[in-house]
Amino acid sequence: MIDTLKGWAEYLVEWAAKDPYGFLITVLLALTPLFLASAVLSWKMAKMIEAKERDQKKKQKRQENIAKAKRTKKD
């Protein structure tokens, strides 16, 4: 298996040396969908974090208002 990987790596290095532009274009075309998926997932995660923070702030404010109302009732 190591021989197979070594041969494959040598082939890639040879290909990159003989046709660098073709190699780079192929690598970029192969990686572009992964970059797009990463961007979409990062955006979704940011939105989820923002929503969670809003909910936490809303709950905190609600708890503060409840505590404030209880204090005014006792007085």
Swiss-Prot record:
Q: Where is the composition biased (Basic and acidic residues)?
A: 52-67
Bilayer-crossing regions: 21-41
Q: How does the record say this protein sits in the membrane?
A: Single-pass membrane protein
* Chief localisation class: membrane
The region called Disordered is annotated at 52-75
Q: Which UniProt keywords apply?
A: Coiled coil, Membrane, Transmembrane, Transmembrane helix
List each coiled-coil range: 49-75
What GO cellular component entries does it have?
Answer: membrane
Compartments reported by the entry: Membrane
Report the sequence similarity comment from the record: Belongs to the SMIM15 family.
**Full protein name:** Small integral membrane protein 15
Q: Which organism is it from?
A: Xenopus laevis
Its organism's taxonomic lineage begins at:
Eukaryota, Metazoa, Chordata, Craniata, Vertebrata
